[in-house]
Amino acid sequence: MDTPNNRGINIRFVTNKKVLWPEDVAAKLFSQYQTMLATKLYTKDMEIVEILSGTTPFKGVYTLEQIKSKIKNQKHSLSMKNLALQKTSQQIDSSPPQTPTTSNGSMMTRRQNANNAISSNNNTNTNVTNGSSSNTSLNGGDEEQEEEEEEENDEDSITNKEDSDSYDDFSIVEETTDIREVQDTRSFKKVKLNSLTSLNEGYIVPPTPQIEMVSPNRNNNNNNINKNNNNNINNNNNNNNNIFNFLQDQDQNQNKPNKPNNQSNFSNQSQQLQNLINATANENKKLKLSMEQLEFQLKMEKEQNLKLKNLVTKLNEEIQLEKEISKQINKSICSNLNIQNSRSISTNSVIFKKDSNDDSIVAIFPTFITTTNSNSSEITLTIDPNPPENYHKIIIKQQLHQHHQHQQQQQQQQPQIQTYLIKKLQDYYDPEPCLIGSTNSKGVYFKSKDKSLLKISIDNLRDFD
């Protein structure tokens, strides 16, 4: 954005509220002005700070708060400087005027001596007439000369009073003691002295007054001059009348033939303006139609997005429902089989324990849990501590309960021992899986990490001796 006085510099603050000031631009800008003025403009994505002027350049990276503090400090320092200047000016105005003096005496005394020297030297004027020089003085004007000297002395006293107020800043003035250096100035002009001018330089010496000799041809010359002046005046009047008549005729000539042209030009301009208005109206109609189409498309897209959002919500609900159903199925299976999970073993070593019912030894790994079904035959899961690569040897031994009435039958039946080789699935196990074992289905079921039932099918079946 350009400022009306074209003194500004645009500084954009991005989202991190920092900006790098160009050294040349900032130094050039802030060295030219003595006031600081900042206006902030906020937009949707960023903040723009427009610095119009300043006293010192800002260089480097500054945050918005740092720039605000600098602006505040500079305004405060400027106000303090203005206050000090006001106090100084008040003190200067209230102090009485003083005439500076030197070791040789006051300035007023020196100026009076110079004036007296000038007035005493008035008798030695040099008169120049028609290129000839004369060293004689005017003998007939002694009384007039005395009156003029008195008037000049009065004027000098008044001028000295006036000049005494303007010599406050004068420090030291060179003193002139040689009277010959001061020229005769019967009607001289005084100027104000400053701290760099001397007493001799304080006066402007006018040219020497000339005395005109009366000649017999003076009257004739005056008559000729008057005639020439009258002729010049008459010629000027005639020229003025001619110019006035020419301008009047030109105005009349311009007004008469140009009326129809002006009307035709006006009609053409009005027709062009009407055409432009019509074209603008057509463009506005097209823009309006395009805007309506865009609004309709946006509306349709919003409806489609809403439908997709509802569909995603429904799918998520169905997935959550399936998970809940899976959990319920797992719970029902474990409860129907009456399987009780034993505690997990948090050791990496293999634990061997002896079964109390028989002499079989069961090896238990931390990732597996032995289960017992009291209503049916006991199922014991045994894992080979040295399985082949990528395989576990799982031994499932089924042993029927011993009953006294069926001792003879039980003696005939030998425990059925089956050995299965399955792939390692420790990546799928839960820390405490629910193990379901069955020899009839020739498979082992585990509860995987995603809370679903995982059936491990039997790859190979062989006898174990």
Curated annotation (Swiss-Prot):
Biased composition (Polar residues): 87-112
Disordered as annotated region, ranges: 87-169, 201-244
Compositional bias (Acidic residues): 141-157
UniProt feature, compositional bias: Low complexity: 113-139, 217-244
Top-level taxon of the source organism: Eukaryota
Annotated protein name in UniProt: Uncharacterized protein DDB_G0288739
Species whose genome carries this gene: Dictyostelium discoideum (Social amoeba)
